[in-house]
From Swiss-Prot:
It is found in: Secreted. The keyword Ribonucleoprotein does not apply. This is Augerpeptide hhe7a. GO terms for cellular component: extracellular region. It comes from Hastula hectica. The presence of a 'disulfide through disulfide knot' structurally defines this protein as a knottin. Expressed by the venom duct. GO terms for molecular function: toxin activity. Disulfide bonds join 3-11, 6-19, 10-22. Keywords: Disulfide bond, Knottin, Neurotoxin, Secreted, Toxin.
Length: 23
């Protein structure tokens, strides 16, 4: 998924594992 489609914290370099696939 694109970063814009994920929670804003997933856009950060230190995003947690549940953000995997969001870039």
């Amino acid at each position: 998924a694109r970063c814009e489609q994920c929670p804003s914290y997933c856009c950060q370099s230190d995003s947690p594992p549940e953000c995997d696939g969001c870039e």
